[in-house]
Amino acid sequence: GDIQAYILQLKDFSDKAFTIFEEDLQRDDRLIWLSISQGRVQELCSSLLEINNELDNGLYQHVSSLIMVSATLTVGESFDHIIRRCGLSRYQQEGRIRTLLERSPFHYEEQACLLMVDDMADPTREPEQFSYQVTEALLNIAETVKGRVMALFTSRKMLSEVSGLLRPLLKGSGIALLVQNEDGDFAALMDGFVNSEKALLMGLETYWEGVDLKGDLLKCLVVVKLPFRSPSDPYASAAEKYCRLHRLNTFNYFMLPDAAVRFKQGIGRLIRSEDDRGVAIVLDSRITRQPYGKVFQNSSPISNQVIISRKEIAQQVERWT
């Protein structure tokens, strides 16, 4: 019985692999990638870049009405991105789409502040200098807040660099440094953070969403870099190819709205109840220096937004924690 089940399972895998290599590879709207762990292939994956036709044929045409609810449907305050990505443009043109943007029940103007540091090195042009400045800023923040700080990174390399610089500086401070991939898995790090009076948690994509730290558990959230996907990211690479073939601007069509939604999700980790209070800090100066920075500013649920210099970090953080 078990052998027969394994044979059927292998046949299923074989059929799917054949479909991917014989059919999906020919399509420009497909992303195909291998998941590799410790030098061994774990998964062969295929995913659609655009799901609008599938949603239309499999869902929209079979219902008379549909309600989509989420905290991250908008970029800035516009629904255009989600309407386009979900294949609803035709229905919008027919006047069949209604949108509603409800304000948060939280009083962000009283509960939180978004600090944007505008004199950091450019993370793309001066990555080494940026890492040093991030280390200095995190040390400053952790010592000011006395722990209860979570820093969100976008790059494993930078996370490792900053961790290596910061760990000896925090030695003897009483502040526990908890770093993804170094100090335990997600559950262990979250448990350590919750049960430590003074802790600085540094993590990657997993921590940008799905983390719920209410009350005094999180006083300061640090966004190290704006969460643009790396050009080497399979999805970003495939999107770039797709946009090029369809003569679309990759940055405006995909990269910017994708990053803005992830940014909103990350900032949303700070205030989780009506009693929370805290400060969010963006260490990527592109949020103030680049024209597209306004998209991120407008995507933040925090309306109190202050532009500061590096030397003002401690003073401003102290005001809100």
Segments (PLM) and residue ranges:
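ASCE RecA-like P-loop NTPase motor cores
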Residues: 1-321
